[in-house]
Amino acid sequence: LIINPLRPLWELNLSGKVFAAAAHTGLTEMANGINQMRLDTEHEYFNSGVMLIDLNAARNLVTAEDVFRCVSEHERELILPDQDVFNILYGSKTMPVEDVIWNYDVRNYSKYLIRSTGKHDLNWVMRNTAVLHFCGRNKPWQADYKNLFGMLYLHYQNLTMRKLHEKSKQERAVQ
């Protein structure tokens, strides 16, 4: 869910990197270490939910053959296949961006709050975060969704439905 402008990400200088993405480090960054060992990498483990891509550079770098070879060679280690393959092949060509701004995992509100010593509260998130990522199995469009950010999703869904309804009425009036 996009709640603030993406332009600063769009205008980011990649400084020679091909991609920019956020790593969901959690409270202790333990997952990074586990993923580095599991995938034999030395960089942060990047989430593939939101990425900035230098398309010209990526077209020269990314090949289907490399992706299929990676899947074949690492099929036993792949837990989140898209992210795992991305990290194995292109993680070293990725610029880290702040997950709290560009790929906020809504399941981890408490962790963000603790990690920031209380700074990244709900008001801060609403003013500063650009992308809320509804990671995991449970989604805000499901009736039993219980996350704090679910109401925000429903609010934007309601606004969208109103706009679509108004547009439809205007189009019918013109005909």
Label the model's feature ranges.
Residues 1-29, 50-53:
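GT-A fold catalytic core of metal-dependent nucleotide-sugar glycosyltransferases
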Residues 3-8, 30-35, 61-66, 144:
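A short secondary-structure junction signal
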Residues 10-11, 42-43, 122-123:
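Short secondary-structure boundary/capping segments
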Residues 15-39, 146-152:
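A short, conserved beta-to-alpha structural element at the edge of catalytic cores
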Residues 35-41, 116-121:
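Short, P/G- and charge-enriched loop/turn segments at secondary-structure junctions
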Residues 47-175:
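A glycosyltransferase accessory/donor-loop signature
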